[in-house]
UniProtKB/Swiss-Prot annotation:
It is found in: Secreted. The modification Asparagine amide is found at N25. SMART domains: NMU. Belongs to the NmU family. It comes from Sus scrofa. This is Neuromedin-U-25. GO terms for cellular component: extracellular region.
Length: 25
């Protein structure tokens, strides 16, 4: 995925944060 690194950058960070902070069910 190398289309808009400037736009996808922050989104990936948010996704990583969501996965890191999501409960382990």
């Amino acid at each position: 995925f190398k289309v808009d690194e400037e736009f996808q950058g922050p989104i990936v960070s948010q996704n990583r944060r969501y996965f890191l902070f999501r409960p382990r069910n």
